[in-house]
């Protein structure tokens, strides 16, 4: 039997092991847990939140302020004629007045400012959750391309070893030059695929770094796409709709608009101004007390338009809550069905397709040793295995994307970050 085909067979069989031994330990490793921590600490959008909180807190302090009293001085009957010559007949009035707010205006301002702070807090939580989900999505994209590059590197080494063996056999006249050309073309295709994957890997890595203020360069991204936790039942996911981030924000906005309606109604009520002071008559050398009372005549509600607008805003939010509940239920059902479809594909690839591809390689190796098939047919069998592994990586990546979308919608943790 020819020893050269046996050498090629041995190389094809031993290559994955040699590949694993050749890998060096990465020096700069990034984990998903660290990536999420980087987002919490360095994301510019999250860093702006404390300033928004300080602004709203200051506005609440402003809302709690009551009107200041007003001091007035009045002089009359001076620099006139006859008895009002010069200041001989002048009258002086020193008075103090105070605006008294009616309709609980001050308390309604405080309630509205408090509702704004709570809405801002919920909005921050939703923004934080969305950014963490985006971080995880981009991290798993990096993991996917990292795994595909490793798989393609394994494939390239296999093709190179086969090319070397075929070139030696071609020199001996055992195979045609067309077989050598075809193998070189296959190697070029692998190189092209590697370049494309490297470009996508770099793009996904830079997209992950966009979330952080400081650039974090890593040699290796830790994680195993095949480790996917069991998803909760569809009923359990539907039960948490009322606590979903978007729904919680709408509920707080409803409370916010309710407080605004109360404020607009109280603003439509007239306020009372009371005043009192002392009056001195220069001509008679007499002093007396004065008292004043004033209130606008409420012929019409001066704030009627704002009240009506606030009522319509409440009705709109109430309608949006109902629509959002229906929309979330539909999205969760769709994603849940899609997840199970992809899970079935992953199981088929793991339990049937890949094992059958491995069996095909063993049978092809045996047939090649017996001279029944060409080396190109043997490599086709090897390509089938790599295609199956690539499909499994892509399927696992899609499963993670579905889980992260469900996390974003429900606010429930579905992925264990410590696994990486």
Residue ranges of predicted features:
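Amphipathic alpha-helical coiled-coil segments
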Residues: 48-60, 127, 131-152, 161, ...
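Short, charged, amphipathic alpha-helical segments
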Residues: 110-114, 177-186, 375-383
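Small/polar, glycine/serine/threonine/aspartate-rich low-complexity segments that form flexible
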Residues: 23-28, 72-109, 221-230, 273-308, ...
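Gram-negative bacterial Sec-dependent N-terminal signal peptides
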Residues: 1-21
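Periplasmic alpha-helical coiled-coil/stalk elements that build and connect Gram-negative outer-membrane
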Residues: 2-5, 127-243, 335-338, 342
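Bacterial Sec-pathway N-terminal export signals of envelope proteins
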Residues: 20-70, 75, 99-100, 108, ...
């Amino acid at each position: 039997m020819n020893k050269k085909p046996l050498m090629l067979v041995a190389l094809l069989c031993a290559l994955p092991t040699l590949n694993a031994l050749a890998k060096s330990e990465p020096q700069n490793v990034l984990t998903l847990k660290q990536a999420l921590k980087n987002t919490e600490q360095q994301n510019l959008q999250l860093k702006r939140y404390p300033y928004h909180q300080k602004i709203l807190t200051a506005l609440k302090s402003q809302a709690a302020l009551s009107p200041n009293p007003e001091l007035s001085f009045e002089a009359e009957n001076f620099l006139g004629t006859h008895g009002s010559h010069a200041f001989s007949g002048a009258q002086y009035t020193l008075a103090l007045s105070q605006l008294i707010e009616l309709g609980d205006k001050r308390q309604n301002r405080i309630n509205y400012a408090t509702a704004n702070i709570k809405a801002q807090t919920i909005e921050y939580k939703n923004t934080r959750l969305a950014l963490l989900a985006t971080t995880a999505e981009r991290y798993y994209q990096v993991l996917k391309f990292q795994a595909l590059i490793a798989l393609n590197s394994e494939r390239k080494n296999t093709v190179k070893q086969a090319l070397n063996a075929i070139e030696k056999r071609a020199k001996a006249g055992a195979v045609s030059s067309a077989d050598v050309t075809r193998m070189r073309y296959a190697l070029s295709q692998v190189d092209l695929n590697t370049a494309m994957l490297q470009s996508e890997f770099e793009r996904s890595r830079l997209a992950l770094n966009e979330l952080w203020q400081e650039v974090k360069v890593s040699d290796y991204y830790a994680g195993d796409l095949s480790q996917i936790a069991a998803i909760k039942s569809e009923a359990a996911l539907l039960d948490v709709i009322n606590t979903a981030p978007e729904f919680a924000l709408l509920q707080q906005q409803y409370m916010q608009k309710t407080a605004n309606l109360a404020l607009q109604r109280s603003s439509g009520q007239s306020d009372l101004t009371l005043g009192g002071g002392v009056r001195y008559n220069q001509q008679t050398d007499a002093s007396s007390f004065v008292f004043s009372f004033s209130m606008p005549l409420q012929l019409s509600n001066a704030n009627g338009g704002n009240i009506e607008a606030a009522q319509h805003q409440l009705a709109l939010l109430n309608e949006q809550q109902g629509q959002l509940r229906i929309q979330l239920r539909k999205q969760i059902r769709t994603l849940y069905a899609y997840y199970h479809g992809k899970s079935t594909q992953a199981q088929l690839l793991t339990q049937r397709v890949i094992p059958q591809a491995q069996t095909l390689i063993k049978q092809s190796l045996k047939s090649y040793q017996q001279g029944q098939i060409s080396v190109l047919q043997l490599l086709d069998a090897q390509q089938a295995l790599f295609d199956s592994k690539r499909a499994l990586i892509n399927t696992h990546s899609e499963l993670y994307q579905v889980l992260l979308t469900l996390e974003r919608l429900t606010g429930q943790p579905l992925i264990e970050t410590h696994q990486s």
